[in-house]
Amino acid sequence: MKFIIFSSCILFVWCDVVLAQPLPIASIDQKEPVSYAKDIAPVFKKSCIACHNATKAKAKLNLENVSVMMKGSDSGEVIVPGNAEDSLVFLQAAHQEEEFMPPPKNKSNAPNLSPKELALLKLWINQGAKDDDTIAAEKKVNFAAMSEKVNAIYSVAVSPDNQYVAAGRGNRIFMYHTPTGKSLGELVDTELKGKGGSAHVDIVGSLAFNSDGQLASGGFRNIKLWQQADPDLVYDAEPVDNVPLVAGVSSDSELFSVGDESGSIKVYISESKKVVTFKDHVTAITGVGFGVGGNIIATSIDGFVSSRKIGEAAQVATVKLSSPINAMAVINGGEQVACGCDDGVIRVLSIEASLEQVHELKGHTAKVVSLSSFGEDLKGFVSGSADSTLRIWQVGEGKVNQVKQINNDQAPISIAASNDGKRCASVSGNAKIRIWNMSDGKLVADGDAGWKLSGEQKSKEMKVSVLTKIRDERKKQLGESDKKLKADQESLKKAQDAEKKSVEELEKKKAELVLAKDLNSKAEVDLKQKEEAKDPELKSAKEAAKKATEALTAKQKEVQDVERKQLEATRSREISERFLKRAVDADSKSKLRLADAENDLKNAAKIHTDIKARVDQEQKILRTVTFSADSAQVFAGSDDGNIYSWETNAGKPCDVIAAKSGLTKAIVAVGKKILVASADKTVRIWDFTPTWNLYKKIGGLQDSKTLVDRVNSLSYSPDGKLLASGGGVPSRSGELKVWNVADGKLVCANIESHSDTISGISFSPDGGFIATAATDRFVKVFNMEGAVLERSFEGHTNHVLDVAWRADGFVLASGGADQVVKEWDFEKGSQKQTVKGHTKGVSSIAYMGIGEQLISSSGDQSVRIANKPLPDAATFIHSSSVSKDGTIIAAGGEDSILRIWTTGDSKLYLKLQ
């Protein structure tokens, strides 16, 4: 009789086995194939799967799908395709074999199969037990648009350069510019426009930036990779004939003009793309602008000022001033033009009164080199002079007054004022930009165009610091292993000496035993002779024999004792040899690790030295400056063709933009965009607003093979080339997969990494390992050679929600639903400490920069640095992220507000919705 173990699933009653009758089986006449997906799977789900699934597989039999069924159970195969009568699944379901399925009085209340169901099961097996479930699975599942009420922030990521923060609200991804706090809009998958226009159809469970600024987002069964787009070239205008020097724009941004070194002016009409060229000057143009009535105003180095209408080419008003003109600005609502002259005087002319001079402003002690107006009605302007000062002027009724003087420390070559009248900026032909507060004349920021390279230098400096720490730790470990090696060598020497001594002692005792045996034999012979002869000395012979026997027994015991000691000495020597071998191996490993650490440090130090040399050598030259239309940013053009930007509130660096042109000669804001005129004679309007495009998708909504369920966690490798994802089927599996970012192909995987879903994942700092946190209460580490388990850490008493590596790679930290943070020694595989303080689950964990301080966030409405709460978390925090350098923390939660703190002062910097 065949037997299959279902004992834990069966209420075995002997009388049932003896007396129970087989279940009735219907007679069916069906020519078409029985469908597993349609006819059999629902039956198993109703009556069998409660006890036979991936989580609870009684007798190791899983009936969830055909492929796992075919693997059989503890006892072997359970389905024989083509022969139902030999298939235990059918026999036990039909109660034709003991161990009925489902068992009588089962706890799941699973019913017996009906006659028709048994008939279909039998026919399906006889037809070959074919699997059409994959076909059924391919049927498209329709997803409805997610409600806008689902807007909690479940995922947050900070870009490696601190410029951007991504926040996953519900199924939408919002991007923010960290320095300015401006919203950059949403990331949208165009294929989902019919579902509300979102990034994912399901909650965005994970976000991560790589070292190149690529953003990865995880949703249901898919990962999406978003790449920051190049600046948008809005208008590639007709080039000028000679090198451009200045540019201007009308108040409505419909017209813009460029003046060149030959005296020509081109006016571009945005709507029609028409270009009109004027040649009203014979020397280099030093200023262009638009006055009331559409007048085009221009000045040239030879002191001429011109005013004309676009459509009236013949009507040109000109006037020559008494000093060469270096700069011009339209002021006073477009009714006047201010001219900065070589003699240090600013001359103000009336545009409507045929360029009649109405004011002469004195104050500068050297030539005026730059002018910039501000305010909606252009009632104010700023002047910059070779005397190294900036002066702020206010236009009143019939007069112009100087209201502020600012010492710029060096002569500016270009200045700009913000439209809101709060800031002015200057560049002086070097890498510096100065941003000033116009209300009090105080310096807001002293920026440097080399900030990005300096930031890279700092990053490499941090790496050198970490590698120095690793090198020092490896030195310490080598010292300890050398000490252990020496101790084990000494122990072996002692063990060998003891063994040698015990061998010598044993040989001695064995010789004594031989002598004792000889004496005992002689005593026995003597005793026997005296007994036979009835010798009167028989008594003394007996005593002598007794003593000889006792001496022999004593020597035998001594030999046994020495043999035992010799065996112990041999074992001690063998143990010492094993310990010494381990010590030799450990010492060799320590030496290799130290050599690797020293080599890594040497290479990193060289890279740092090279970058430092570049910082010292590369002198950026900023030549022109302008503010954005909203006054939030200031842009500076340089000799290297790049456009550099800073936010204006505190002067934090924003971006370095490759305008793909030569040396920048003039820049000006055109609405929300920037006009760039370059030495290569190009005139282009750019939209520098950062945007991201969907670059690649991994997996799909209908594809459960690539990614089985939600992607709860993502982590890029240090070089940004690999992406690790963590997920799985809740209560069933933990899915760890590693992807090649370039082509989206799978590199390695471990789909049985955990017994429950992975909730946190992190690449080690050297990229050789991946740490995972899962709801099965384990923290695990897998190597990159096939995602093989390297370490397993047990200690959390509830779901583990996140995991992070310390920068040196020696220690990991994890946070869990048990409200604690734990630190683990990776190489020793042991727990270092448990940190308490949170009163709800710890949702995110990270180390701050290259240090040892921990950042933790929790549902208890707190984000903490070293267990000290930051101000105003004030909501259930689902996710937090710390910048690579540890200077800012971003967090979001149930109230949908993105909060950003600066770690240096623990202050809330931004609250964004």
Segments from the language model and where they lie:
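Secreted/processed peptides and extracellular or luminal domains of membrane proteins
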Residues: 15, 54-57, 795, 837
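WD40-repeat beta-propeller superdomains and closely related acidic/aromatic-rich repeat-like regions
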Residues: 131-913
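Aromatic- and Gly/Pro-enriched helix-to-coil junctions and flexible linker segments
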Residues: 19-164, 169-172, 179
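Residue-level signal for beta-strand positions within conserved beta-sheet cores that form or flank
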Residues: 16, 59, 732-734
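Bacterial N-terminal signal peptides
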Residues: 5-16
